[in-house]
Amino acid sequence: MVAIKDITARQILDSRGNPTVEVDLLTDGGCFRAAVPSGASTGIYEALELRDKDQTKFMGKGVMKAVENIHKIIKPALIGKDPCDQKGIDKLMVEELDGTKNEWGWCKSKLGANAILAVSMACCRAGAAAKGMPLYKYIATLAGNPTDKMVMPVPFFNVINGGSHAGNKVAMQEFMIAPVGASTIQEAIQIGAEVYQHLKVVIKKKYGLDATNVGDEGGFAPNISGATEALDLLMEAIKVSGHEGKVKIAADVAASEFFLQDDKVYDLDFKTPNNDKSQRKTGEELRNLYKDLCQKYPFVSIEDPFDQDDFHSYAQLTNEVGEKVQIVGDDLLVTNPTRIEKAVQEKACNGLLLKVNQIGTVSESIEACQLAQKNKWGVMVSHRSGETEDSFIADLVVGLRTGQIKTGAPCRSERLCKYNQLMRIEESLGSDCQYAGAGFRHPN
């Protein structure tokens, strides 16, 4: 048996310059590293990301307490354990070493989901090496998936930013392109990159050079006023790139960010202080707006169209457009099996956004994915806006056979390292894999 010999944790910086946790896990087979991401628009039901709150350092965002928890609590308990026992190690960290719970399950508020996840991911890499497998194949075995014919995902590139990710007036957070008409991941990434480069030219011509600055996830944030303006830019870029018909559109609305709790309305002008309230919409009005957009543009997926507790509006929209358009829960579900069960019962959505740091372990991420797939949902594996050079989710999406991933624009190294890893995986698999393409919601 291979055993864990040592664990070293440290504070590093993510793509926004904020501290995050990195772990080196040592076995007889070598040293295995993992670093965790963090989000800007976070759902209130996510597992706890432990921050130091010392305002004299990194504006309170240090993670030295999480690092200390790894060294003092997690490491002594894991020395000598078999890294191939992923479930056992995750369970030990979550239920015994941490042990904190809320109504939605294990919340990791003692040790921090960032501490637990870093160790969980490093352990997964060590387990793969011990079994002599590439990480994606090892994850497939953990999930009980076949390893003979793998599925390469459709990449959803976030190329125009609004919402909390941008300084423009657009309420919706992400406008994405999805090259479903490609035949390989390599071709899909090429199409995505070409549309992105043409979009840059289109934006520069219309709004000037400074409009091509990029946001946290590599997308552009031109000074546009609303969703239709953003979508028209996308359609123009797709057209001039010569990829019409091969590229569909998706959006992450992140509606919880502009839901006014007291008035129970959505404010599409939420970034203008003391605005005239003319852009406020009820759940029903917002639903009708989405339906209009879906008729006008080639939408295949809409994420977080309503507030994270507005199960009713979700269910109505899913009922009305869900066959043609995937309705994805992110803040609604926070990769949490208990929240997924509730959404299944209420028929609230038909897609899960899978973010490993929302739930905090590899095992629970696999469980959430399997629960969604069992209920015939789509599953989109996702990065966070604060990322690192760790490409774990590229292997995860192939291992879990979800057929779809979003990890930013084809720009900025912390995004590209995931796309580049997907191309490497496809190359190593050769004819033993297929591109999910138009069937990305239910890849066979």
Swiss-Prot record:
The active site is at 217 (proton donor), 355 (proton acceptor). One of its GO terms (biological process) is glycolytic process. The keyword Zinc-finger does not apply. Mg(2+) is required for catalysis and for stabilizing the dimer. CDD domains: enolase. Mg(2+) binds at residues 252, 303, 330. SMART domains: Enolase_C, Enolase_N. The keyword Metal-binding applies. Pathway: Carbohydrate degradation; glycolysis; pyruvate from D-glyceraldehyde 3-phosphate: step 4/5. It is found in: Cytoplasm. Signal peptide: none annotated. Substrate binds at residues 165, 174, 303, 330, 382-385, 406. GO terms for molecular function: magnesium ion binding; phosphopyruvate hydratase activity. It catalyses: (2R)-2-phosphoglycerate = phosphoenolpyruvate + H2O. Keywords: Cytoplasm, Glycolysis, Lyase, Magnesium, Metal-binding. Pfam families: Enolase_C, Enolase_N. It comes from the Eukaryota. One of its GO terms (cellular component) is phosphopyruvate hydratase complex. Homodimer. While ENO1 and ENO2 display similar K(m) values, the pure tachyzoite-specific enzyme (ENO2) has a threefold specific activity at V(max) compared with that of the bradyzoite-specific enolase (ENO1). Belongs to the enolase family. This is Enolase 2.
